[in-house]
A protein has these predicted regions:
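N-terminal beta-strand motif that seeds the catalytic metal site of vicinal oxygen chelate
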Residues: 1-24, 81-90, 140-143
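A cross-kingdom feature marking solvent-exposed beta-strand/loop segments within repeated
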Residues: 2-5, 9-11, 33-39, 43-45, ...
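Vicinal oxygen chelate
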Residues: 2-6, 49-52, 60, 88, ...
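Short, structured motif recognition centered on aromatic/hydrophobic residues
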Residues: 10, 14-17, 27, 51, ...
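Amphipathic alpha-helical segments
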Residues: 19-34, 100-103
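Generic structural signal for individual residues within well-ordered alpha-helical segments
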Residues: 24, 39, 94-97
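C-terminal "cap" of GNAT-fold acetyltransferases
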Residues: 41-57
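Short, charged/polar surface micro-motifs in flexible loops or helix N-caps
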Residues: 56-58, 68-69, 93
């Protein structure tokens, strides 16, 4: 089991969308949610936006593909627009990854990669997480 002090919150729910600008307009006009951060992650092949949900600290992450080879483009082709991932905020991604591997879970990366806002991220394979793509997010530290 992962110790409580390592897994501290739901960070965000990731939603795959074909067009980020259209999705931002929909979430603003329908739910009153606005982007608090946008970036392009070339390594992961996505343009993304984080939308705060009130003052909860949790976000909706909208993910649009940059090209046909990106994971998000493949997800959209297979499943259409919709929830792509559930992300947990962790305090030590290396410790959480080691614990999960000891329990037999497969992680997608050998070492964490750069995520949104210079966070460190890894993913638990859906077959080892009840059919859900679970993202582990260790926020960047303020320097």
């Amino acid at each position: 089991m992962i110790p409580k002090h390592l897994l501290i919150a739901i960070d965000h729910v990731g939603i795959a969308v074909p067009d980020l600008d259209d999705a931002l307009e929909f979430y603003a006009s329908t739910f009153g949610l606005h982007s608090i951060h946008e970036e392009v992650n070339e390594e992961q092949g996505v343009r993304e936006a984080m939308l705060a949900v009130g003052d909860s600290g949790q976000c909706i992450q909208l993910l649009a593909p940059l090209n046909e080879e990106s994971t998000i483009a493949k997800f959209l082709a297979r499943n259409g627009q919709g929830i792509q991932q559930l992300a947990y905020r962790v305090t030590d991604i290396d410790a959480v990854s080691a614990t999960l591997r000891e329990r037999g879970a497969r992680l997608l990366y050998d070492v964490p990669k750069r995520g949104t806002s210079n966070s460190r991220v890894n993913f638990v394979h859906p077959k080892d997480a009840g059919g859900v793509l679970v993202e582990l997010v260790e926020p960047a530290t303020a320097d």
